[in-house]
Structures are given as structure tokens and as C-alpha cells.
Regions:
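Short, well-formed alpha-helical segments that are part of the catalytic scaffolds
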Residues: 1-12
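Short, structured coil segments at secondary-structure junctions
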Residues: 12, 33-34, 113, 137
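Catalytic-site signature of metal-activated, phosphate-bearing donor transferases
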Residues: 48-54, 61, 65, 72-237
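Alpha/beta-hydrolase active-site loop signature
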Residues: 23, 44-45, 69
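Conserved donor nucleotide-binding strand/loop of the catalytic core
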Residues: 28-58
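A conserved acidic beta->alpha catalytic loop
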Residues: 9, 20-29, 66
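Hydrophobic/aromatic residues located in beta-strands of well-ordered beta-sheets
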Residues: 15-16, 141
């Protein structure tokens, strides 16, 4: 749905690599208009899929973005500058500018700055099914000022479906590692997530959408831990 805008925002890159996991829209067709490095594979999870893409890269630096994200012209200039001016850095965090239901949020979830720009050598993605991490060798990690646009939720149905999928994947992943939790713990974590987004990260300054985002993540966090709890309930025959 947003692949064209995503790729257009990074056309200045020396190489563009696109991985598709069997989408049924025109994603592959559109992507091939911009790069010949388009790969269609199965879906092993977010971490393994991004590791596959990383292994195809040949340039020194990698910018990892999802199809619902875009690089602003200002961020592009800053990226070019920082790679020249800070030779000791091995990676950079980039602040998000989350868009929800057609409006940008400047606080709350937009207060996060995920690690997205990094040196390829020695880097790898974790094997997490969801909420994957970039694992780096020791070194300096900087933070940019420009924002990475993130069009995360186009409507309420899409947001709820995404949160349900992510919470279940997270629970399965933790269950496989032998982790356990309880309903009280689910409530504690979800309340903390709400206050973290709405109060500590100033989500209340984003108005009604800021409140809605905090509530959605309260629900999402509760569902994660409640799902993990449910997976550990003995099945009675």
C-alpha cells in the first residue's frame, strides 16, 4: 500500500533491497520498477526476514526501514552529513514521527528512537518473530535529530488486527523460551506502558490521538502477558 512512497524516499541510496513474503497486492511489481534486488520468500518472522535482507547487502552502511516508513529530505541530508562527520560511530538511532489515522504524533510513541542506521560489518538481527533487535559489536551509537515517518495505523480495524497478531507472536516466542507470567503481572506491565507513553513521554500533548495511542498500547501490553499466561495453563483432558 505504501511501498512506492517508501522507496521514493530512499532513492538516493547506493543500493535498495526489498524482501516480500508473498504479498497479494502489487508490492513486488512496484518494487521492481526501482530496483532489481527484489526477493520473494516465505515468512520466517521479522528478525529472520530482516537478516536475510542484511545478508544481501554489500555496502558499508545499512538503513533498515519497513514499508510503512519514509525518510524525509531533512533526514536524508543529516544521514549524509553524520556518516562523514562522525567516523567513530557504528550506528545511529532515528526518532520516529508516528502518524495515526491521518495525523502526526510528536510525543508519546514518537518519543522513541529505534536503531535503524548501522555499519553492516559485524551486525546481525536477532531471530525474534516480532520486535526484533539489531545486534552490534561494541562501539559508539549516535542519535539523529531528523524524524523517520512511520504510518503505523490507517484505521482502527488495522490497528487492532496488528496488535492482536503481535501480542500472540510475542507470547509464543516467550513461551518457547520457558517464560511464565500471571494476570497481575499483565496488569502491572500494561499500566506502566500507559503512563510511560501518556505521561513520561508527554503523549497527552498529542490530544485525543495521543490518549488513544496510550490506551491501545495499554491493551496491547496486557494482551501480550495475558496470552503468555494462557499458554502456560495446563490443558485438561
Amino acid at each position: 500500500e505504501k511501498i512506492r512512497d517508501c522507496i521514493n524516499s530512499v532513492l538516493w541510496a547506493d543500493e535498495i533491497i526489498v524482501f516480500d513474503s508473498g504479498s497479494t497486492d502489487r508490492t513486488v511489481e512496484l518494487a521492481k520498477k526501482y530496483t532489481d534486488k527484489v526477493y520473494v520468500t516465505d515468512w520466517p518472522g521479522y528478525g529472520p526476514q530482516k537478516q536475510r535482507a542484511l545478508e544481501k547487502a554489500v555496502k558499508d552502511w545499512v538503513l533498515s526501514i519497513d514499508a510503512d516508513e519514509q525518510v524525509t529530505p531533512e533526514l536524508r541530508v543529516e544521514i549524509d552529513t553524520c556518516l562523514e562527520d562522525d567516523p567513530k560511530a557504528i550506528a545511529f538511532r532515528i526518532p520516529w514521527a508516528v502518524h495515526i489515522f491521518g495525523k502526526r504524533l510528536d510525543f508519546g510513541r514518537s518519543g522513541r528512537a529505534p536503531l535503524r542506521l548501522f555499519k553492516r560489518e559485524g551486525a546481525r538481527f536477532s531471530d525474534a518473530q516480532v520486535h526484533e533487535k539489531i545486534i552490534l559489536p561494541s562501539g559508539k551509537i549516535g542519535k539523529l535529530e531528523g524524524r523517520l515517518l512511520h504510518f503505523s495505523h490507517r484505521n482502527m480495524l488495522q490497528a487492532l488486527e496488528k496488535f492482536i497478531q503481535y501480542s500472540w507472536l510475542w507470547a509464543q516466542q516467550r513461551h518457547e523460551k520457558g517464560e511464565k507470567t500471571g494476570i497481575a503481572n499483565a496488569l502491572l506491565h500494561s499500566c506502566w506502558e500507559f503512563f510511560n507513553i501518556y505521561v513520561f513521554r508527554l503523549g497527552f500533548l498529542d490530544g485525543r490521538r495521543g490518549l488513544l495511542m496510550a490506551i491501545l498500547f495499554w491493551q496491547y501490553t496486557f494482551n501480550k502477558y495475558a496470552s503468555l499466561w494462557s499458554l502456560n495453563i495446563p490443558v485438561k483432558k
